[in-house]
């Protein structure tokens, strides 16, 4: 009987498993990777992408392509609930995924408080691809007028972004 392995997220902790996904498939495992993006971005290079040192293709891993090339299934979605008794994951799309074995590597996210004003000009550092969007807005808007940019947060990411 085929068992179902689900990798929740395609981040660093799953890189070795993703590189050897075909081994699981050849052992008759059905392998599904669930993630919010077809790519996984290396967060350590995010500030360099913001500063135009790197382009997105230089700091990302093609998760979907890697999974599908090895016989796995990639689902672009987000897990919103886990039922460990039923071994079932609920996805943001409304779909449900049953599993025999699941591993979580979903990374971090930034939850913004309610903020009034121009939401289109507020960028979080996660997901990392938002830094590219910020870079494009800054590049476009800075040709029109001098910009005032605020970095909120004093941790390592805030220091790197403001530097």
Which stretches of residues belong to each language-model region?
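Glycine-/small-residue-rich active-site loops that bind phosphorylated ligands and cofactors
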Residues: 13, 81, 157
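Broad hydrophobic/π-residue packing in well-ordered secondary structure
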Residues: 33, 39-42, 47, 97-102, ...
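Short, electropositive alpha-helical surface patch
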Residues: 91, 156-163
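Divalent metal-dependent hydrolysis catalytic cores, especially in the metallo-beta-lactamase
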Residues: 153
